[in-house]
Swiss-Prot record:
Residues 51-220 form the Helicase ATP-binding domain. It comes from Helicobacter pylori (strain ATCC 700392 / 26695). SUPFAM superfamilies: P-loop containing nucleoside triphosphate hydrolases. This is DEAD-box ATP-dependent RNA helicase RhpA. InterPro entries: DEAD/DEAH_box_helicase_dom (IPR011545), DEAD_box_RNA_helicase (IPR050079), Helicase_ATP-bd (IPR014001), Helicase_C-like (IPR001650), P-loop_NTPase (IPR027417), RNA_helicase_DEAD_Q_motif (IPR014014). GO terms for cellular component: cytosol. Homodimer. Interacts with RNase J (rnj), might be a member of a minimal RNA degradosome complex. Its main location: cytoplasm. ATP binds at A64, Q65, T66, G67, T68, G69, K70, T71.
Amino acid sequence: MELNQPPLPTEIDGDAYHKPSFNDLGLKESVLKSVYEAGFTSPSPIQEKAIPAVLQGRDVIAQAQTGTGKTAAFALPIINNLKNNHTIEALVITPTRELAMQISDEIFKLGKHTRTKTVCVYGGQSVKKQCEFIKKNPQVMIATPGRLLDHLKNERIHKFVPKVVVLDESDEMLDMGFLDDIEEIFDYLPSEAQILLFSATMPEPIKRLADKILENPIKIHIAPSNITNTDITQRFYVINEHERAEAIMRLLDTQAPKKSIVFTRTKKEADELHQFLASKNYKSTALHGDMDQRDRRSSIMAFKKNDADVLVATDVASRGLDISGVSHVFNYHLPLNTESYIHRIGRTGRAGKKGMAITLVTPLEYKELLRMQKEIDSEIELFEIPTINENQIIKTLHDAKVSEGIISLYEQLTEIFEPSQLVLKLLSLQFETSKIGLNQQEIDAIQNPKEKTPKPSNKKTPQHERARSFKKGQHRDRHPKTNHYSKKPKRR
């Protein structure tokens, strides 16, 4: 049955139209029921523009960042148009195993009332087991390029004529060196297949690929201004290099996030920070590319099921990681580029919920942060790392064990100081040694480099120094209560 929708323009700007509801997009009642049960309220810009185009059978090239609702943008119209003819009707190609599994879960959820059957094909899983699943006549296949190509070359997939082919996170597949595999995969696909290409950026190799495999596509572009989620509060803290782990621990204590992701630059750093947090009794788990498939899946499931509430991850998790309820994202280092920053913070502030994105920077990274802030055209506010609050000190004192050596030291000190004076001095020392990050004078020196002010140091600052109000919109953090182509693809 054809949908009687008005013709679509060949290029769509994300700001061009009013925002409709899902009921306006031409989806079946059974699909809409799953949409609303999944917690969606209204379509995101990419969903608003892509869904009608896909329903009409048009090829689509869409540029939109992670976290904008791309999966539902192609999944919903695909589910809507499935015929249940006992063949693989749609193929989704994606760069990583994690993303493949998440897309499969999303399609299963959105296809609940249409009984959509999926199969997930990726490396690291038994080929024999995958072949058994493929023989059960799934309607949608989600696959990583390498394993899919292996199946095709060895003729393990019979009657493989998908009507729709999706290339998701195309620029990531370029970065991972999969473009030659993609071209070879297209040798096995029918030329009449509808092609949907989604990418966060559009480097030249991706544009050249699109020119080869797409026919008269609808072009959709969701500008960066649509991407910076206003539900995400962005802030940064200036620290010294050696204070990163302690700063994360302090912020976890004072922010008390329900569920958080800490992004690190390296796999080794992810392991080390996870081990540090675990040793301090935080429910932490790690995720990075050196972990085997079983451990990676175990970490993701532990985080999803709240067995762990802190996920320490490299950028392997920043693309496509779709876990609900993430209240905070921490950047252990300033990300290497703006793209990475946007992808990372997109893990929070989803489905209309508020989120917090926190970045740790050193004085040397400050100018780069300002440049990044200008690029994303969004304010990242400067805050000061909070000190230990009174409740924490009382708890620390209450839990502290008194040894014979401490008793002996106490007796010596009370001969020098009055007991009340001794307590005050020890509390002052506790507050001074609990300081993390730069003091007011050091922050001023970064903001006003022309002024002759002392360089940042590790010198401890009395608590009353920190009590002075920040300048220029700063806020004091409140404590909570407790590329080339090997050959041209053939379209046949």
